Amino acid sequence: MNTERSAAGGSRRRALLILAGAALLVLALLVGVVVSLSSMFSADEPSSTYQGPPAATGPGADGGGAGGGNGPEAEAALAHAPMLEVPGQAALPHTLSTRSAGPPITLPQPEQASGVLVPTGFPDTEQGAIAQAVELTRVGFTGADPQVWAQAYDSMAEPGAAPAAQTPASQDLVAFRRAANMPRTGPTRATVTWTPTSALVKGSTDDGSYVVTCVLGELVTDYKGRVATGGLGNCLPMRRVGDQWLVASGPRAWVAPATWPGSDEAVSVGYRDIIR
């Protein structure tokens, strides 16, 4: 088994268990489900698919952007560059930072929003790549349903991109539903939504045709007005193909740190507010 991401996956897995535990507690309080939340916060379970990092010293280790060349090797280096590790509790709501990772990122509007599953038609800029990743994640995270993610992802993936089921986002949703005692796919008693708040560019190739971007938002579980919320991020390798940004062929991107938007941890990763 690959071990390239085990440490990052372990931290993120703890964050997902905490978020799912909060969601499950909301459901338990309302429908009388008898659960033991303590089991969710016990010793780390080994990740079955995440790969664990080398020392975080490469591009993206401090949350900053990076570049260097073009072609498959340069793209793989950007995708695989480690991200800052954060504790699982960093995903829960807590005090906002007085610091900033930089000015807000203004996102463009899509040229096509009707008749498509995921809005598309963003300009050939880094902001366009971020905006496309935001829309894909927003649609794909609806209901925290791995099947919905697969449909949205497949509609925007270049041939040769990592299969949807092998992406960290899909694994996150599977883990969240399992920990929250929800069915693997399909409707649930709760409404689960993801609202984008922040983003960063981890790096791009010199020609700008390949961009690794990470987006962060609030994952909200609502059951009849009772709400559990937390931060959940998603990193995607994006490639400019014709007049569109698509999820790039080649390796998947490093796991996005799960942080509460606007917190010190989010700022340290490099997340900046997004505006439209």
State where each predicted segment sits:
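Short beta-strand edge/turn micro-motifs at domain boundaries
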Residues: 72, 90-111, 231-262
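Hydrophobic single-pass membrane-targeting/anchoring helices
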Residues: 5-44
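Juxtamembrane and targeting peptides
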Residues: 32-131
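Structured, amphipathic secondary-structure segments that form assembly/contact surfaces
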Residues: 3-6, 146-242, 252, 259-265, ...
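Core segments of small alpha/beta cavity-forming domains
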Residues: 100-178
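Intrinsically disordered, low-complexity regions enriched in glycine and serine
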Residues: 2, 6-8, 64-66
